[in-house]
A protein has these predicted regions:
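Hydrophobic loop/turn residues within beta-sheet-rich immunoglobulin-like superfamily modules
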Residues: 7, 20-22, 67, 76, ...
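Surface-exposed, short loops/turns at beta-strand junctions within beta-sandwich domains
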Residues: 11, 20-27, 121-123, 134-143
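Surface-exposed binding patches on compact interaction domains or structured appendages
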Residues: 1-16, 79-128, 194-212
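A short beta-strand micro-motif common to beta-rich folds, especially ectodomain repeats
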Residues: 15, 26-38, 129, 140-153
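Solvent-exposed, low-complexity, repeat-rich "mucin-like" stalks and linkers
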Residues: 1, 53-101, 173-203
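Edge beta-strands of extracellular beta-sandwich domains
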Residues: 40-49, 156-164
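Extracellular interdomain linker/stem segments of modular secreted and single-pass surface proteins
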Residues: 48-56, 164-171
Length: 212
């Protein structure tokens, strides 16, 4: 991770040492030696400072189709463990069931458990969580929830998960009613997820809607 410039030289000379950006949570070290043509040697230890503990998502937003299904959310971290939690919005909240496990640096890891082999010590790793079997949205409103990812040190990343609005639907419990000569009231029960209005229509329109 260290660049030496120049790598070789003669007599008195200033040598520059620079490093690649370090994303690991722990300091890293490289040991170097310099040797003359005559066999004299000296050693140098180069330390690079640790990066701050971090967790972040690849995107602040994720989406679910109105028909439901799965949604995968990814990000990066260098923490020793990650804990996932979901909070539905107060209005039009989306209910999500978190899985027991997620993937950290390619390894299946339990939510909130210490990550095997501590990959974050050396650098940032990729994490991924898949929320499965999101039900269809039967409302005409978008539904939202917040996925919160918390690192061991308390750092957080939030992702807003939005499910597209469902289709407007309406059902009647009868196709035909027959009023008596006095016009005595009868009831048709309407089941809908939307506002609705009655209006007169042509007979052919009604028959077509009924599939006749």
């Amino acid at each position: 991770f260290v660049t030496v410039d120049p790598v070789s030289g003669s007599v008195d000379h200033a040598v520059n040492f620079s490093g690649e950006k370090h994303t690991g949570r722990l300091q890293r070290t490289i040991n170097l030696t310099v040797t003359t043509n005559g066999g004299a040697k000296k050693a140098l230890v180069v330390n690079q400072a640790a990066a701050a503990e971090v967790v972040r998502s690849d995107s602040p937003n994720a989406s679910v189709q109105k028909t439901g299904g799965n949604v995968t959310i990814t990000g990066k971290s260098n923490s020793t463990k990650l804990t996932f939690a979901v909070t539905p919005a107060e209005e039009n909240g989306l209910t999500l069931q978190l899985p027991a496990n997620y993937t950290a640096a390619g390894k299946t890891t339990a939510n909130g458990a210490v990550i095997a082999d501590d990959p974050g010590a050396a650098g940032e790793f990729v994490w991924s969580i898949t929320i499965s079997d999101v039900p269809a949205n039967v409302t005409i409103e978008e539904l939202t929830a917040t996925l919160k990812v918390t690192a061991a040190g308390g750092q957080t990343a939030n992702v807003t998960v939005t499910q597209a609005a469902g289709d407007s639907t309406i059902e009647l419990d009868k196709e035909t009613i027959n009023l008596d000569v006095n016009g005595t009231q009868q009831t048709v029960n309407v089941t809908s997820n939307d506002s609705w209005t009655w209006a007169q229509a042509a007979a052919r329109t009604v028959l077509r809607m009924m599939g006749r």
